[in-house]
């Protein structure tokens, strides 16, 4: 552009073609998609001067001072400028080139002229043209905001929403009544000022739907594109603008777009999940559309508009359902939408003059601000990620440290447990050893006790043996003493016998015969039976005496024969005894009393004691019981 400083055009062309039309909104609507180009064009444009000559045959730089770039579109860029002398803020839209094939630019200029009577279309202040390069600049009034930039910074109340939305419906209704489809309704193409007025800009894709019936389906920004366009329909009408207006209504109340698809496939899926899946029942012949196979695999979703917007009024939901109807033939028109109770029920819409003012911001500025905010957010996110990574690294280190510490603790615990087990095992071993020692000691004590008991028993046995030996010894001694006494007595008796008269009478009778005589006397005195005598005789004599008796019996016989005059039978002795008793009775004092028979040692009883008969006494017939012979005779 700086090289075109001397080119001029006729003023009639500018005044007749752009007297009441505006296209600054068109540039601002597409600026968000070409931000980098906007920055480069801005630097190039601002660095030079506007050399184009306007209808006054003056240079544009003589009338306007460029301040900043506020938008970028398909056909050109939009700049914020000040009119010199009046300090009036204006918007300059630069069309890069106009060739015979550039139908969009020609149609936009034609539509601006056709729709200049509509108050909701941005008016044209002036136009500057360069015929050699087909470049021209249109001067529009400056609007403080576009709706996208405004919603990015502020949340609107329901009365504000109703005010802006009613103006939008009124403006689009007049455009449709003029037989024109806008085909790019979106928040960035809606311009508002601080007086509360809304204007529709960017007619670059607008076209008349009365002159032809087949159109391109690749129109309207993706987030605001109607489902029939996404399904590939090429026969459509102004109802596509009503779908876009429904999306703008959601954006007005939520300050964000509810259908942000990144591709046509994702956009169709988002529409189906929110508004329901299109079928032939609710939309006849929809399955015949070119791109229907993109949603044929989807389940039949019901509409979720009432669920998602359940916190809003019923009239708002009904209006939204009418605008976002899948079947385009049943979709509300702008005129029908203006009859909605949404605008007559409380809260009522604000009047434009009562709308609050805001700090100026446009979509490019909003985009730049969003980019800056996004960069800040990315930087912040990056810092947070770094911080998070550091925290995670620290956490991992702490976790690793804790794991190592836990391992150390587990190791120490295992060591303590092992040590404890060893100590316990040692204690158990010691306890078992002690028990074993104790058991051995008990066994030893028991053994010692048994041995002691055995020793005691042995000692007792020895003591008893000793006692028995002593007893036997005493008995032996007593026996010997008794034998000695007996021998002494026998000696004494023998001595007495030698001295006794009986011995003189029978001196030649041996001891055996004396014993026989004594036994006969004893048996006679005790009146014992023959059997008793025989038993006593057997008990009385020992074996040696029996042998002596048998050996001496023959000698006695011969001795008795030889000494027959000296042998006196027992009966003779008894007779003599009786005679003596009778003699004593007859002559008691004739002679001195003789000694009793018991004084004779040969008349003593044998070792086995016998009781003397009561009929025999030695007291010369005295019957006194005290003088009876009751003491047994003992032979020593």
From Swiss-Prot:
Claim: Nucleotide-binding is one of the keywords in the record: yes
Residues holding ATP: 70-78, 93
Documented EC number(s): 2.7.11.22
Biased composition (Basic and acidic residues): 473-485
Biased composition (Acidic residues): 529-555
Region span, Disordered: 1-41, 378-408, 473-506, 527-555, 579-636
Domain Protein kinase: residue ranges: 64-343
Keywords on record: ATP-binding, Kinase, Nucleotide-binding, Serine/threonine-protein kinase, Transferase
SMART domains with a match to the protein in the record: S_TKc
Pfam family name, one: Pkinase
Residues at the catalytic site: 184 (proton acceptor)
Reaction equation(s) it catalyzes: L-seryl-[protein] + ATP = O-phospho-L-seryl-[protein] + ADP + H(+); L-threonyl-[protein] + ATP = O-phospho-L-threonyl-[protein] + ADP + H(+)
Record-linked Gene3D superfamilies: Phosphorylase Kinase, domain 1 (3.30.200.20), Transferase(Phosphotransferase) domain 1 (1.10.510.10)
Compositionally biased tracts (Low complexity): 486-499, 579-594, 617-628
InterPro entries (alphabetical): CDK, Kinase-like_dom_sf, Prot_kinase_dom, Protein_kinase_ATP_BS, Ser/Thr_kinase_AS
Molecular functions per Gene Ontology: ATP binding; cyclin binding; cyclin-dependent protein serine/threonine kinase activity; protein serine kinase activity; protein serine/threonine kinase activity; RNA polymerase II CTD heptapeptide repeat kinase activity
SUPFAM superfamilies: Protein kinase-like (PK-like)
GO biological process, one term: positive regulation of transcription elongation by RNA polymerase II
Similarity remark: Belongs to the protein kinase superfamily. CMGC Ser/Thr protein kinase family. CDC2/CDKX subfamily.
Descriptive protein name: Probable cyclin-dependent serine/threonine-protein kinase DDB_G0278487
């Amino acid at each position: 552009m700086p090289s075109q400083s001397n080119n001029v055009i006729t003023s009639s062309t500018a005044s007749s073609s752009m007297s009441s039309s505006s296209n600054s909104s068109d540039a601002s609507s597409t600026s968000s998609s070409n931000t980098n180009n906007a920055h480069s064009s801005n630097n190039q444009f601002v660095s030079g001067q506007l050399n184009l000559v306007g209808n006054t045959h003056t240079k544009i730089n003589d009338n306007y001072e460029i301040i900043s770039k506020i938008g970028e579109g398909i056909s050109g860029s939009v700049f914020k400028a000040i009119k010199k002398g009046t300090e009036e803020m204006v918007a300059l839209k630069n069309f890069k080139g106009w060739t015979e094939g550039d139908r969009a630019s020609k149609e936009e200029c034609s539509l601006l002229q056709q729709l200049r009577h509509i108050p909701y279309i941005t008016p044209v202040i002036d136009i500057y043209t360069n015929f050699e390069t087909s470049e021209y600049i249109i001067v529009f009034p400056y609007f403080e905001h576009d709706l996208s930039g405004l919603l990015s910074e502020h949340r609107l109340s329901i009365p504000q929403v109703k005010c802006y939305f009613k103006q939008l419906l009124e403006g689009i209704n007049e455009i449709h009544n003029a037989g024109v489809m806008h085909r790019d309704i979106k928040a960035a193409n809606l311009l508002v000022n601080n007086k509360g007025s809304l204007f529709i800009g960017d007619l670059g894709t607008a076209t008349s739907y009365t002159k032809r019936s087949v159109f391109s389906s690749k129109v309207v920004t993706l987030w605001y594109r109607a489902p029939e366009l996404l399904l590939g329909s090429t026969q459509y009408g102004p109802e596509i603008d009503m779908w876009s207006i429904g999306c703008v209504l959601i954006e007005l109340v939520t300050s964000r777009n509810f259908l942000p698809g990144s591709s046509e496939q994702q956009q169709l899926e988002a529409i189906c999940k929110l508004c329901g899946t299109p079928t032939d029942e609710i939309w006849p012949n929809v399955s015949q559309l070119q791109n229907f196979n993109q949603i044929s695999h989807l389940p039949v979703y019901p509409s979720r508009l009432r669920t998602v917007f359940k916190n809003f009024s019923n009239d708002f939901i009904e209006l939204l359902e009418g605008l976002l109807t899948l079947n385009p033939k049943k979709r509300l028109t702008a005129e029908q939408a203006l009859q909605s109770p949404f605008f007559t029920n409380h809260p009522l819409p604000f009047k434009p003059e009562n709308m609050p003012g805001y700090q100026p911001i446009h979509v490019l500025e909003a985009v730049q601000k969003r980019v800056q905010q996004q960069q800040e957010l990315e930087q912040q996110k990056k810092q947070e990620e770094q911080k998070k990574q550091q925290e995670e690294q620290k956490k991992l280190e702490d976790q690793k440290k804790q794991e190592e510490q836990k391992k150390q603790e587990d190791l120490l615990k295992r060591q303590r447990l092992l040590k404890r087990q060893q100590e316990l095992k040692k204690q158990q071993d010691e306890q078992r050893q002690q028990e074993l020692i104790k058991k051995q000691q008990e066994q030893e004590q028991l053994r010692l006790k048994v041995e002691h008991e055995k020793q005691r028993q042995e000692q007792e046995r020895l003591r008893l043996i000793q006692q028995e030996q002593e007893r036997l010894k005493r008995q032996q001694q007593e026996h010997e003493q008794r034998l000695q006494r007996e021998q002494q007595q026998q000696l004494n008796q023998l001595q007495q016998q030698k001295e006794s008269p009986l011995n003189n009478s029978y001196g030649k009778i041996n001891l055996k015969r004396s014993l026989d005589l004594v036994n006969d006397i004893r048996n006679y005195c005790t009146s014992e039976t023959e059997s008793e005598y025989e038993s006593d005789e057997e008990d009385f004599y020992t074996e040696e005496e029996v042998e002596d008796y048998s050996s001496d019996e023959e000698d006695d016989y011969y001795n008795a024969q030889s000494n027959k005059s000296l042998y006196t039978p027992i009966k003779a002795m008894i007779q003599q005894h009786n005679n003596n008793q009778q003699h004593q009775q007859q002559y008691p004092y004739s002679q001195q009393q003789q000694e009793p028979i018991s004084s004779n040692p040969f008349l003593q009883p044998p070792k086995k004691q016998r009781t003397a008969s009561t009929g025999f006494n030695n007291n010369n017939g005295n019957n006194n019981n005290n003088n009876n012979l009751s003491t047994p005779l003992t032979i020593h």
